[in-house]
Each structure stands twice: as C-alpha cells, then as structure tokens.
Amino acid sequence: MKLGAYYKGGDLKKPSGGKKRKVRKTKKKALGGGPPQIPKLGENDTRIVERVRGGNLKVRLREAKFANVYIPKERKSVKAKIISIISTPANPDFARRNFIVKGSVIQTEVGKALVTSRPGQDGVINAVLIE
C-alpha cells in the first residue's frame, strides 16, 4: 500500500504530495464588515452610510447624544438628551464603556428609558420611557 492513499492532511496537500492552491481570489462579499463598531455615548450624533449586499445602503450610528423617547402615558415621542447608560443586559461591560445597544437602559432628560431600536443597524436610538 502507498502512503499517499492514507494521507490525512487534505486541506494543504494533494495525494501526490503537491501543494493545493486557492480555488479563487477572495471576494468582497466574503470579507464581512470588519470588527464590530458599537455606538457610544458622545458629544454629538455621528452616522456613517455604508454600501451593503445588493447595493443597498445601511446607516450606522457611531456616536449618540440624543434619543427619540416614546412616553406611553402621553402617547407622544420627544427628542431627549442622553445623560448616561444605566445598564445593558446583553453585556455588563457595555454600560461601563458607554456602548448603546438594543435592550440598554438609558438615563435621559425625561427619565429612564429602554432602547428598542438597534442603533448600529438603524442609525437612530428609539426608546420607551419606563419611569
């Protein structure tokens, strides 16, 4: 029996011992969007517009100062300044680092609010007043 028939390193070499080459070059769609950039509490609202699959555009929020807060009792929404991030159930470290994600509890001018939108995907912070 030949050793080549039982060679296990299939991802690097061929049974003949030759080196395997790439089938195609790396396509842009396979690269992904890079490391996650989570929106932070900042001095002003900063957004970036990114081209995504299908030629569509996605608005991403980088820094946030204001949130659209819905007040259930009054049935209206107001633009409120964000004072601080109280807690983030997704990751406790996010609150310490001032990252704003869906599910975060934020302190605003009108009171505590729960973030209902995905700021990194939608480009806006929508929240519902909880106190």
Curated annotation (Swiss-Prot):
The keyword Ribonucleoprotein belongs to this UniProt entry's keyword annotation: yes
Segments of skewed composition (Basic residues): 16-30
Subunit relationships: Part of the 30S ribosomal subunit.
Single GO biological process annotation from the record: maturation of SSU-rRNA from tricistronic rRNA transcript (SSU-rRNA, 5.8S rRNA, LSU-rRNA)
GO MF annotation, one: structural constituent of ribosome
Species name: Pyrobaculum aerophilum (strain ATCC 51768 / DSM 7523 / JCM 9630 / CIP 104966 / NBRC 100827 / IM2)
Record CDD domains: Ribosomal_S8e
Alphabetical keyword list: Ribonucleoprotein, Ribosomal protein
Gene (UniProt): rps8e
Pfam families, per the entry: Ribosomal_S8e (PF01201)
HAMAP family linked to this entry: Ribosomal_eS8
GO CC annotation: cytosolic small ribosomal subunit
Protein name per Swiss-Prot or TrEMBL: Small ribosomal subunit protein eS8
Entry superkingdom: Archaea
Family listed: Belongs to the eukaryotic ribosomal protein eS8 family.
Region (Disordered): 1-42
